């Protein structure tokens, strides 16, 4: 037995597409019987075709201000709540929950994923127990890197809020992402934390990775924006905070702590152990810092450390070393 019918009344909805204004005729869904938390006679959202909402399962479009059209499919026990606009071949199934969102251009949502008060556009997969919460822009785009077919994914138990995730980025495991910008093929996974704020985001770009129990934290002062570029990695229990820029072939691991003012690492730099680096510091070209080494630039001063060099043990550096002294 069908669980809903389409209203006789139609509603014309206009929307922009490819720089042009399009219009579509929609009809409202009306429940024919009680199921789940829906009662017979309840009016829901608006669709352009009965194929949009499956007659089987408990899936439903709850809000009378929601529009779903142009090749979209809602299946299983999926719930669409709040005012949503969903169009252009979006697929929502299983126990997915969408609340107050704009979804379009081939996005796939399944399993127990939650998406709230966000925009999702482009071919991507949001799945598992992942949560995409308030203020996110998920903008997928393929063909911008060598991995031309890789699609943007957020899955497992990852939580993302107030962030912009674009291109082919991957967020998974138990990662937590707040106020961040993640682009291209960057990855955030395991128990990693990206923790920006309403003033400064955390940036993870290109092929950079944050994983393990690593923490990357933005400050609240001007330019306190931690940025990982190219192939930079922050792993294990490392902590990177404030105005830090990590570039080519940089690995920060162990229990290392970096606090920028500004701090820049580039060209095959490895920081591990319990190393600590603070202040206006530039480290470049085959430098390894390990054990309990400390590098701190004095206030109003800068420090340059260029390799090849190894700094380890209990070494404590507070000024640029003389040539050959290390």
Task: Say what each PLM segment does.
Residues 70:
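Glycine-rich active-site/cofactor-binding loop and its immediate structural neighborhood
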Residues 1-58, 62-64, 77, 83, ...:
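Terminal amphipathic alpha-helical/low-complexity segments used for targeting or macromolecular assembly
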């Amino acid at each position: 037995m069908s669980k809903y019918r389409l209203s006789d009344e139609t509603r014309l909805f206009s929307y922009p597409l490819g720089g042009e204004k399009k219009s579509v005729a929609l009809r409202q869904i009306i429940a024919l019987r009680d199921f789940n938390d829906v009662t017979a006679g309840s009016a829901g959202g608006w669709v352009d075709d009965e194929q949009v909402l499956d007659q089987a399962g408990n899936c439903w479009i709850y809000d009378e201000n929601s529009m779903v059209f142009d090749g979209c499919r809602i299946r299983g026990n999926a719930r669409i709540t709040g005012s949503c606009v969903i169009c252009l071949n979006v697929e929502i199934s299983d126990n997915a929950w969408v609340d107050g969102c704009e979804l379009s251009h081939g996005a796939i949502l399944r399993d127990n994923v939650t998406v709230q008060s966000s925009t999702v556009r482009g071919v991507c997969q949001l799945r598992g127990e992942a949560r995409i919460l308030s203020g996110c822009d998920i903008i997928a785009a393929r063909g911008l890197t060598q991995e031309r077919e890789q699609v943007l994914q957020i899955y497992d138990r990852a939580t993302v809020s107030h962030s912009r995730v674009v291109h082919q980025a991957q967020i998974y495991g138990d990662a937590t992402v707040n106020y961040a910008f993640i682009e291209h093929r960057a990855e955030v996974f395991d128990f990693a934390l990206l923790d920006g704020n309403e003033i400064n985001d955390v940036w993870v770009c290109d092929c950079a990775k944050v994983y393990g129990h690593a923490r990357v934290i933005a400050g609240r002062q001007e330019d306190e924006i931690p940025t990982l570029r190219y192939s930079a990695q922050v792993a294990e229990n490392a902590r990177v905070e404030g105005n830090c820029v990590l570039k080519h072939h940089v690995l920060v691991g162990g229990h290392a702590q970096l606090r920028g003012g500004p701090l820049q690492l580039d060209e095959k730099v490895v920081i591990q152990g319990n190393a600590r680096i603070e202040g206006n510091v530039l480290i470049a070209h085959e430098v390894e810092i390990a054990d309990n080494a400390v590098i701190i630039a004095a206030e109003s001063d800068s420090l340059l450390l260029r390799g090849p060099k190894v700094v380890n043990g209990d070494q404590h550096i507070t000024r640029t070393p003389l040539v050959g002294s290390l």
